């Protein structure tokens, strides 16, 4: 095929024909699958049932820890959807020894980060630290995990922020598409048909006691997996994680998921939003 391209010569644009031997009338054959070599890793289980997986990665002097508690949105009753996400937001606030601002200042001094998030199937605590500052960062992680302080003022503020975000999303094409797609795929009444952030009417009735109970009942050892990746050996990191044995040694019962709609034919759904600056497309099936 031939393509025309304009080129500049002494300030004047000249048309030059570019010859291409690529056949665009047929799909090219896929190349060989790349060989993926998994790094060596180690596994262990603490006395309270926590599974830990780790791998040495010494390219840069950092350590990353990811704590994943199964549950999240799945542990919520339908009338209080958004509880897991709101609890995670509250855990990012004050602790027994630090205000939220002071906690972030300490992290900044260390060049570290700690965050708590909740999704459709779990709550995750993520930590990143320079190797030389690992001990100090782990002390802050322990503080965040065991000494988070929940206050009515924080609940009111964070709940209102979430509600305002949900209201704003009603005008965003991407959010509209995601919300409609979830309900079509999973069906009304399915937990995954609702955003983990919850809905306005469910958020409004969540109490401080709900937050406290959810934190205590969901962050338990039997649903926790820990991943450690970074510039540290197994025999060095495990003693530093001894504080994890203080996590309650108990499990929780995850609710069974209802069946999803059976889709037997291709169907096109159109959401008309006049003057929208962009279009969104979602394609999928269960």
Task: Identify what each model region corresponds to.
Residues 1, 53-55, 59-147, 159-167, ...:
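M16 family metallopeptidases and their MPP-like homologs
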Residues 1-45, 53, 225-230:
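C-terminal regions of mature proteins
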Residues 4-16, 188, 220-221, 225-286:
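An aromatic/glycine/proline-enriched structural segment found at the starts
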Residues 25-44, 183-224, 254-261:
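Histidine-acidic residue clusters that define the catalytic metal-binding segment
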Residues 36-38, 108, 265:
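Residues that act as N-cap/strand-start positions at coil-to-secondary-structure junctions
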Residues 42-47, 269-272:
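Short acidic-hydrophobic surface loop/beta-edge motif
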Residues 147-150, 206-208:
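Peptidyl-prolyl cis-trans isomerase
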């Amino acid at each position: 095929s031939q393509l025309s391209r304009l080129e500049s010569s002494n300030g004047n644009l000249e048309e030059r024909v570019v010859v291409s031997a690529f056949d665009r009338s047929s799909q090219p054959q896929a190349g060989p699958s790349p060989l993926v070599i998994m790094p060596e890793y180690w596994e262990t289980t603490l006395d309270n049932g926590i599974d830990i997986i780790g791998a040495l990665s010494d390219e840069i002097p950092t350590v990353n820890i990811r704590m994943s508690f199964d549950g999240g949105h799945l542990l919520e009753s339908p009338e209080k959807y958004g509880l897991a996400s709101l609890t995670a937001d509250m855990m990012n606030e004050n602790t027994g020894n630090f205000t939220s601002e002071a906690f972030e200042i300490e992290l900044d001094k260390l060049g570290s980060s700690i965050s708590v998030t909740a999704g459709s199937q779990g709550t995750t605590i993520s930590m990143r630290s320079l190797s030389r500052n690992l001990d100090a960062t782990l002390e802050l992680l322990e503080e965040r995990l065991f000494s988070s302080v929940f206050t009515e003022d924080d609940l009111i503020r964070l709940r209102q922020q979430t509600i305002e975000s949900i209201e704003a999303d009603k005008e965003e094409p991407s959010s509209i598409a995601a919300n409609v797609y979830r309900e079509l795929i999973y069906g009304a009444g399915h937990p995954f048909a609702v955003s983990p952030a919850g809905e306005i009417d469910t958020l409004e009735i969540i109490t401080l006691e709900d937050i406290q109970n959810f934190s205590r009942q969901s962050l338990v050892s039997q649903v926790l997996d820990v991943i450690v990746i970074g510039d540290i050996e197994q025999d060095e990191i495990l003693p530093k994680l001894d504080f994890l044995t203080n996590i309650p040694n108990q499990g929780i019962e995850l609710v069974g998921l209802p069946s999803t709609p059976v889709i037997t034919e291709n169907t096109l759904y159109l959401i008309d939003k006049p003057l929208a600056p962009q279009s969104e497309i979602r394609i999928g099936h269960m």
